[in-house]
Amino acid sequence: IENLPNKEWWKLDANLTGGELFHLIHELDLLCWLLGDIEAVFAQAANQAHHDTPDSRDVLQLLLRFKNGVLGSLEMGTAYRLHQWGIQIHGENGVIEVNFFTSSVTFNYLDGKIEHVDLFDEFEADLSLRESAKGTQQYNVTHAPCQLWLSRAAEIEVQSVVEHLTQGKISPLSLCLTEAIEVAEAAKQSMVTEKQISVKK
């Protein structure tokens, strides 16, 4: 847990950015893509460690109800001593674990079979993510080099968009365009009202 040296940085202004929930929108976006539309959310948040930036909410918890009946939870923030970064999906036939620290996905089947796959098709990109995940993510650092894993992820996204536009291929990026933002907006409302909020479509 580190206090940020530049408290005037625009990204710390929740009125401009929406706050931590919108900074970490990618995991919520991934849940929408993997599990389907979310119909309701209950959320709570607090500033546990970054008291020098009082508008910051460094711990956020969301309870999610999906339209298909699935229940989910999402916890995120920057005030944790023991960092975790991953996703678990529990289903009828086993458990899928995405671990961003190890850059891997593990499939645990009911019959005891276990399969592991890397997140990237390139060893160097997986290694880059593993190394990057060990430390504090640095932002607003002038001339800081982009991590290889992040560059590769951006390249994959761009290639997907190009193929969608030039070849008509269905892109995962086009399937959930605004869902995560809509859920995040509902979560913000829930934090204020302390009530479950239906997600507007």
Specify the residue positions occupied by each region the protein language model found.
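C-terminal hydrophobic helical "lid"/dimerization subdomain
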Residues: 178-191
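Beta-strand scaffold of nucleotide-dependent catalytic cores
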Residues: 73-76, 98-100
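C-terminal glycine/acidic-rich active-site capping loop/insertion
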Residues: 66, 93-175
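A general structural signal for well-ordered alpha-helical segments in protein cores
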Residues: 27-31, 155-162, 184
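Predominantly a Rossmann-like dinucleotide-binding segment in NAD(P)-dependent oxidoreductases
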Residues: 1-53, 194
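C-terminal capping/lid region of NAD(P)-dependent oxidoreductase domains
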Residues: 189-201
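Glycine-rich phosphate/pyrophosphate-binding beta-alpha loops
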Residues: 25, 75-83
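Active-site beta-strand termini and strand-to-loop segments that position acidic
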Residues: 57, 62-69, 89-91
